[in-house]
């Protein structure tokens, strides 16, 4: 109720700028960053729990572990990363390509001109809705042959490999940001979707 009352009060105070240009400062900014830290920490622990479950269930041995996140606020350096990941000098990071082709295992170069960042993936060739209209589940299944997955279906069609740019598109454009150490090919792929 308290949150709803504050929101109602804030709606009554119409800002003099369009919503997309609105910002917070002072105490509201500090509260926002505080809450963002909590949400990002919760997400980190959630990812760790999922990884622990998969590692245990598959009987894997972890040789190296690190986290790469995108679309977040780097609160230590006050960098908003939308469509990018941290690529500080010497930092290990992962850049996903698609469900079929895997990910690039990289080391950051700490390029200040790139805001100490790298792209968070290959990028889409088309919107999610366009992908669902352009491709079929049978095409999707064929593309995923050789990779164990229970995630190929109509609800995940927007994530099919054909909806994304190819590996060469990103490899040829990220040299200023990272060194590519290896290409990791998936053996198991899971993507949550709507139940069918």
Q: What is each stretch, according to the model?
A:
Residues 1-196:
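Domain-length cofactor-binding catalytic modules of enzymes
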């Amino acid at each position: 109720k308290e949150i709803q009352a504050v929101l109602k009060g804030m709606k009554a105070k119409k800002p003099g700028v369009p919503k997309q240009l609105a910002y917070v400062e002072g105490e509201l900014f500090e509260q926002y960053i505080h809450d963002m830290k909590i949400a990002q920490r919760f997400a980190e622990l959630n990812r760790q729990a999922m990884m622990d479950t998969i590692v245990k269930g598959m009987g894997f041995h972890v040789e190296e572990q690190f986290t790469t996140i995108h679309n977040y606020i780097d609160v230590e350096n006050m960098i908003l990363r939308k469509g990018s990941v941290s690529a500080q000098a010497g930092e290990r990071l992962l850049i996903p390509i698609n469900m079929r082709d895997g990910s690039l295992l990289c080391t950051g170069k700490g390029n200040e001109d790139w805001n100490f960042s790298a792209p968070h993936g290959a990028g889409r060739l088309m919107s999610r809705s366009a992908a669902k209209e352009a491709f079929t589940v049978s095409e999707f299944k064929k593309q995923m042959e050789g990779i164990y997955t229970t995630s190929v279906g109509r609800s995940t069609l927007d994530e099919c490999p054909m909806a994304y740019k190819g590996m060469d598109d990103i490899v040829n454009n990220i040299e200023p940001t990272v060194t590519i150490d290896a290409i990791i090919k998936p053996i198991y792929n899971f993507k949550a979707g709507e139940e069918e």
